[in-house]
Curated annotation (Swiss-Prot):
Record field: transmembrane: 5-25, 34-54, 155-175, 193-213
The UniProt record lists the keyword Transmembrane: yes
EC class of the enzyme, as a word: hydrolase
GO cellular component term, pick one: plasma membrane
Protein name: Protease HtpX
Membrane-topology annotation of the record: Multi-pass membrane protein
Organism this protein belongs to: Xanthomonas euvesicatoria pv. vesicatoria (strain 85-10) (Xanthomonas campestris pv. vesicatoria)
Lineage per the UniProt record: Bacteria, Pseudomonadati, Pseudomonadota, Gammaproteobacteria, Lysobacterales
Cysteine-cysteine disulfides: none
Amino acid sequence: MFNRIFLFLLTNLAVLMLAGIVMSLLGVNPAQMSGLLVMAAIFGFGGSFISLLLSKFMAKRSTGAQVITEPRTPTERWLLETVRRHAQAAGIGMPEVAVYDGPEINAFATGANRNDALVAVSTGLLQNMDQDEAEAVLGHEIAHVANGDMVTMALLQGVLNTFVIVLARVVGGIIDSALSGNREGGRGFAYYIIVFALEMVFGLFATMIAMWFSRRREFRADAGGAQLAGRSKMIAALERLSLNHGQNTLPSQVQAFGISGGVGEGLRRLFLSHPPLTERIAALRAASGSAM
């Protein structure tokens, strides 16, 4: 975890330094630029990491997930035993296991680190999947935890937030100066309107980047689930999802780490956290064929 954080911070620092050089060549005041970079990094990473640290609490609160402390039914006992087996195989600490009330077939994982995670499944999943399929879904979620996807996505979001804040203000300042004829850095009311509009536009592009990365992580989590539970079980689980694919009612902060995502065509696909189920199934089958 700490190696990943160090690498992301180092990368972010290098890119921000490059941005500072470029902006200085464009005539942006270096003193103002330094303050802007610091402010952007604080707000960009601050919000992202606060969300990460509160992710388990917010997920439980928003879904009404009930953590299983003492199993009361054979199903709850099986859930705990399966998650424990997958966690041991993946080399991570035992996550909390919870069930939340929801008709859709879904599950999610969240948490600030690999050894303090939460894995939750919907009642719809327990009612509509057999144990082999559910085992594969749990393997998929454990793979998310083992791969450190929650931390990685928080770091990526921090980098993107930082760039949105910086670029919106730098470009907004240049546009405002050009429109007003003021080259001394004065700020009129129009500047704040321009910055707000640019943050919306750049934010859309940042979301596309984050969702593209999330889709890549889904393929990797599918492969991890196949390794933990078996490739045929993982394929069967995804096929079951494709037959019972409904609206994703998970809260936005955990949708990226669920087993099931939304459906969309055209531009909408750019904002999906999950690849189409057909592509995920095809990837698993292709990997199975190449391994033979």
